[in-house]
Amino acid sequence: ESYGLELQTNWKPNDEYAFGFGYTRTESYDGTTCDNPDSTAGPGSAACNDEMNVRVPRHQVNLIGTKIFSNNLSQTLKLKYVGERRDYGNINNGFEDVILSNYVVVDLVTNYKLFDTYNLNISAKNILDARYSDAYEYKAPGRAINFMLKKNY
C-alpha cells in the first residue's frame, strides 16, 4: 500500500536559462514484512524498524538548472536529494531491517551539437563524490565522467 504526492515544474524565463524542480513525497506500508506473523518482524520490532516499503524514500527532490550558450551548446547542473529509506538486512546484521542514510548527488552535463548531425554529451556524475548506498552494503559509484557521441538520422 502506498500513496503520495509528486510535483514537477519547468520554467524557461528566457532563451538563455531553463530551470526544473521536482518533489516526491511517498507514504507506504509494507504489510508483507511488517505484518508477517511467522517473522520476527512486526510493528515496533527491530526487524521492522520502519514500515515503509524497502528502498522507497519519503522525500525526494530534484533541481535542474540549464544555461543555454547557443543553439549548439548548453550546460546543465542537476542536484538530487534522496531521503532516508528502509532496506532489508542480511546475514551480517542478523537480517534486521536497516535505515539507509539520506544523500545528495550533483551532476554536471555539457551538450554540444556538431554539424546538426551529431550530439556530444560529457557528463560529470556525482561531482561532489558523495558516498551513499541505494541498497544495504552496496555502495553507489563515486565520481565519474562519461562521454557519449550520438548520431541523429
Where are these regions (language model features)?
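Membrane-spanning beta-strands of outer-membrane beta-barrel proteins
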Residues: S2, R58, Y103-V104, G142
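Gram-negative outer-membrane beta-barrel transporters
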Residues: E1-N90, T117-N119, L128, M148
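Surface-exposed coil/turn segments at beta-strand junctions on protein surfaces, enriched
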Residues: K12-N14, I68, S101, K113, ...
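C-terminal beta-signal and adjacent terminal beta-strands/loops
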Residues: Y81-N92, V105-Y153
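Outer-membrane beta-barrel domain signature
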Residues: C48-V54, F95-I99, D134-Y136
